[in-house]
A protein has these predicted regions:
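N-terminal secretory signal peptides that target proteins for export/translocation
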Residues: 1-7
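Bacterial N-terminal signal peptides
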Residues: 10-23
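Transition segments tied to proteolytic processing and entry into folded domains
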Residues: 22-153, 157
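Structural detector for internal amphipathic alpha-helices that build alpha-solenoid repeat scaffolds
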Residues: 128-136, 159-176, 197-211, 231-243, ...
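Amphipathic alpha-helical scaffolding segments comprising HEAT/armadillo-like alpha-solenoid repeats
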Residues: 139-147, 171-188, 212-223, 245-257, ...
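Eukaryotic acidic, Ser/Thr-rich intrinsically disordered low-complexity regions
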Residues: 335-391
Length: 391
């Protein structure tokens, strides 16, 4: 039993790690913070009410809500201007806040299960009502609606609007982004109060709606020591390539080649190449993208990631370079050895790869079996993708 556990544990850990780093399907490639939006939450509630808290009674554990707006209606609310919540919620002093309350209705009783405090005068009711009205609308109309709220004064609203974009696949927003106001996007990118996690989204917006000369805005951000150390660098790089394909790609390739660049910068460049490979091979030929990634094979701290991408893309003409990693210091680390093994196992009809696998099977048959099982797991969870370098 102990032997079985020793065999299974590395496989389980590797499978879990693979699952954790997988990008959510249908999500913006340059965004973080995917998840349920307030609009989604409203959709699952029986009713959603907005108003002012009053008459909080600690003894009875009740609080009244004076209804100012009904975001999601229910028959229970008809004719009511005040509802009593079965929760003790002492309101803040003064008249600064209103409350958005999500409720279920069970056995003829109101069940408030979530409350959100928002500043008085907030656009929250109008925002949520507008979003609900667009539930069945075309994606273009939804995107333009949420775009208007990205700079809303209410952080709950602006962050929720951002989350809608974060949950949207690139293929669904690509065309709409072409008609966005570039001047407004540039203003957001330059604003000191713009959260760094939004740089990637805004840069990709500019990549579609901007002019070639707007690339200097993104280049300046990439050269800024403070901004290039934050999240969203892959989006800045991708936007640069969209606006100036030749110049932008040379910049990305230069980062990939430079071992002295910080790991996070080179990794951002690698993520940019992944985006270009999957979504925009019209900007840079796949053969060029593969050769750009191949530059990472000589860099010990990132070689394994390069091997994994080359394998997933089916770039078998670089098999010799991948197998040559056996001669490097990087190959002494288990993660690099595993990536080379997976590459060799996946490589079709290649004598050198087959010989490598045969040798490894003699040395460590358990490691080879585990690698084969992981590849089967990956194949069952991932749609088939074309192989080759797109020559």
């Amino acid at each position: 039993m102990a032997g079985l556990l020793r065999r299974s544990l590395p496989l389980l850990v590797a499978a879990l790690a693979w699952a954790l780093v997988a990008v959510p399907a249908g999500a913006c490639p340059f965004c973080s913070g995917q998840g349920q939006t307030l609009t989604d939450e409203v959709g699952t509630a029986s009713m959603v009410i907005y108003g002012q808290l009053a008459n909080a009674n600690e003894g009875n554990e009740t609080t009244d809500l004076k209804i100012e707006a009904v975001v999601k209606d229910h028959a229970y609310l008809r004719g009511k201007k005040v509802v009593t919540l079965s929760r003790y919620v002492p309101p803040a002093e003064g008249d600064q806040y209103r409350y958005l309350v999500f409720c279920d209705f069970f056995k003829e009783k109101l069940d408030p299960y979530r409350g959100l405090a928002v500043k008085k005068g907030s656009d929250m009711p109008a925002y949520l009502k507008g979003a609900l009205e667009l539930k069945d609308a075309k994606m273009e109309k939804k995107l333009k609606f949420f775009f208007q709220y990205l700079d809303n004064e209410d952080a709950e609203i602006s962050n929720d609007a951002y989350k809608f974009f974060a949950n949207t696949d690139y293929r669904d927003y690509r065309e709409t982004f072409k008609s966005l106001p570039a001047a407004k996007v540039i203003k957001w990118l330059r604003a000191k109060d713009t959260p760094s996690f939004r740089y990637g989204l805004y840069a990709s917006m500019l990549g579609h709606c901007g002019k070639p000369e707007d690339a200097k805005v993104l280049r300046a951000m990439l050269e800024d020591p403070e901004k290039k150390a934050t999240s969203g660098v892959d989006g800045l790089l991708a936007g640069y390539v969209m606006l100036q394909p030749k110049e932008g790609w040379q910049y990305v390739r230069g980062i990939l080649k430079d071992k002295s660049k910080e790991f996070l910068m080179r990794y951002a460049a690698l993520r940019t190449v992944r985006f270009l490979w999957e979504y925009r091979p019209d900007l840079v030929a796949k053969k060029e993208l593969a050769m750009g990634v191949a530059q990472l094979l000589s860099q010990d701290d990132i070689a394994d990631l390069a091997v994994e991408d080359l394998r997933k893309w089916g770039v078998w003409d670089l098999t010799d370079r991948v197998l040559d990693l056996q001669k490097t210091e990087a190959y002494k680390t288990p993660i690099v050895r595993r990536s080379v093994l997976r590459f060799a196992l996946s490589c079709p009809a290649n004598k050198a790869a087959a010989a490598y696998v045969a040798e490894q099977r003699k040395k460590d048959p358990t490691a080879v079996r585990d690698a084969e099982e992981l590849l089967k797991l990956e194949q069952s969870a991932t749609p088939a993708t074309p192989t080759g370098t797109g020559k």
